[in-house]
């Protein structure tokens, strides 16, 4: 409320400040700030690119980073026997025959990418051990932390990454999910298929960066020159 003095009367006349105009402008400013904040938050979220689609593999920089040993790849175990009607490879706590073929396909793809500067570690569970064997073509060492899917998983990954050597982990969807959460990957993108590979840049100089993922089938569709 404002008060205006009226000459000749000795009286004050009450009036109202134009709150409607002020409020309208204030709302626009507040709305703009909210929109800008939401946009910044959206753009800051890590995205998991489909490296088997279009030019995503080339634009990710994965190949060059792999040559320098600056990549961590987390691979979910192949199809579980106890959750599938397909024929089991062996015991019920392992993978299926179809899963072993998928793991072999992933292994062939990694061979084309190059395993000279790579270190493989698997979770000790049967399904991850079998998957790792078919990926590598031989027995792979196991360590408990690779199967401990909790909030400390990312720190364990960072701590076990050696400079100049790619790290390949045969693990579980829960572990990959925990890692993605700490990287800011939105819930709708935090999923991994059987034998899907999730790639992260980890060079020891900058913060880890999500590069993208490849499922088991996509490895076959990649030409040799795309992996060199």
PLM feature spans:
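Flexible acidic/His/Gly-enriched loops in nucleotide-sugar-dependent glycosyltransferase catalytic domains
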Residues: 155
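Generic beta-sheet signal
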Residues: 71-72, 163-171
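Active-site-proximal alpha-helix that buttresses catalytic centers in soluble enzyme cores
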Residues: 2-144, 149-152, 160, 176-178, ...
């Amino acid at each position: 409320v404002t008060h205006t003095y009226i000459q000749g009367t000795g009286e004050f006349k009450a009036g109202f400040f134009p709150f409607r105009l002020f409020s309208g402008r204030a709302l626009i400013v507040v709305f703009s700030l909210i929109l800008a904040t939401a946009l910044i938050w959206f753009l800051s979220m890590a995205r998991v690119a489909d490296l088997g689609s279009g030019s995503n593999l080339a634009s990710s920089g994965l190949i060059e980073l792999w040559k320098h040993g600056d990549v961590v790849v987390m691979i979910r175990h192949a199809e579980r026997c106890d959750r599938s009607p397909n024929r089991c490879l062996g015991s019920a706590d392992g993978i299926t025959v179809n899963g072993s073929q998928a793991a072999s396909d992933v292994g062939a793809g990694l061979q084309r990418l190059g395993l000279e500067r790579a270190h493989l570690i698997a979770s000790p569970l049967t399904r991850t051990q079998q998957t790792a064997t078919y990926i590598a073509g031989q027995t792979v060492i196991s360590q408990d932390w690779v199967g401990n899917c909790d909030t400390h998983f990312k720190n364990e990954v960072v701590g076990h990454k050696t400079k100049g050597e790619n790290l390949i982990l045969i693990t579980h969807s829960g572990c990959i999910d925990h890692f993605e959460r700490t990287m800011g990957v939105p819930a709708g993108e935090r999923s991994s298929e059987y034998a899907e590979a999730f790639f992260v840049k980890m060079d020891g100089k900058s913060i880890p960066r999500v590069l993208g993922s490849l499922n088991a089938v996509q490895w076959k569709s990649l030409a040799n020159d795309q992996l060199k």
